[in-house]
């Protein structure tokens, strides 16, 4: 089983309805490979202003976003257990959950797992990659008794 060193940073004043550190730990561990290795992950919960600034600087997108993933790339020959950093915008996650008629807690789980899969190298740039990533997310969420986040709810 993977060993996780989790650094949870709360950098938003809106802390109502945030998941606990134990929740984040569970979701991250679900998305890690089942290997006997150590992983270090930072999750930073931010406001829309910080999300917007980071999304603009690193992705060229002039708006806040739900989750940003920053994989750690060690220099050649250096092996460290750092997987990377996730930056999750609390306000965007809450807005999306409301707009998509999803339970807020479930959407937090989805965004965390989605971000960890990005840190592990998964992506959704093309349809095949998106299908694979969505399938893994759906399976991991189902193991937590969370329904398929890609099903449209009326």
From Swiss-Prot:
GO molecular function: metalloendopeptidase activity; RNA endonuclease activity; zinc ion binding
The record's free-text note on cofactor binding: Binds 1 zinc ion.
Necessary cofactors: Zn(2+)
Enzyme Commission number: 3.1.-.-
Keyword Ion transport tagged: no
Keyword Metal-binding (UniProt): yes
Pfam families linked to this entry: YbeY
Main location (coarse class): cytoplasm
Compartments, record wording: Cytoplasm
InterPro entries (alphabetical): MetalPrtase_cat_dom_sf_prd, YbeY
Keywords, sorted A to Z: Cytoplasm, Endonuclease, Hydrolase, Metal-binding, Nuclease, Ribosome biogenesis, rRNA processing, Zinc
Binding site for Zn(2+): 114, 118, 124
Gene Ontology annotations for the cellular component aspect, listed alphabetically: cytoplasm
GO BP annotations, alphabetical order: rRNA processing
Family as reported in the entry's similarity comment: Belongs to the endoribonuclease YbeY family.
PANTHER family in UniProt: ENDORIBONUCLEASE YBEY, CHLOROPLASTIC
HAMAP family, A to Z: Endoribonucl_YbeY
Function: Single strand-specific metallo-endoribonuclease involved in late-stage 70S ribosome quality control and in maturation of the 3' terminus of the 16S rRNA.
Name of the protein described by the UniProt record: Endoribonuclease YbeY
């Amino acid at each position: 089983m993977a060993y996780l060193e989790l650094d949870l940073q709360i950098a938003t004043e809106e802390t109502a309805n945030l998941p606990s550190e134990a929740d984040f730990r569970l979701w991250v561990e679900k998305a890690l490979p089942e290997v006997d290795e150590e992983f270090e992950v930072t999750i930073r919960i931010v406001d829309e202003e910080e999300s917007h600034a980071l999304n603009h600087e690193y992705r060229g997108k002039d708006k806040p976003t739900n989750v940003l993933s920053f994989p750690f790339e060690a220099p050649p020959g250096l092996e460290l257990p750092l997987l990377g950093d996730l930056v999750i915008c609390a306000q965007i996650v809450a807005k999306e959950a409301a707009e998509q008629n999803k339970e807020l807690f479930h959407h937090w789980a989805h965004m965390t797992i989605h971000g960890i899969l990005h840190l592990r190298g998964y992506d959704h740039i093309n349809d095949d990659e998106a299908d694979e990533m969505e399938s893994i997310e759906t399976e991991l969420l189902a193991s937590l008794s969370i329904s398929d986040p890609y099903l449209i709810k009326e």
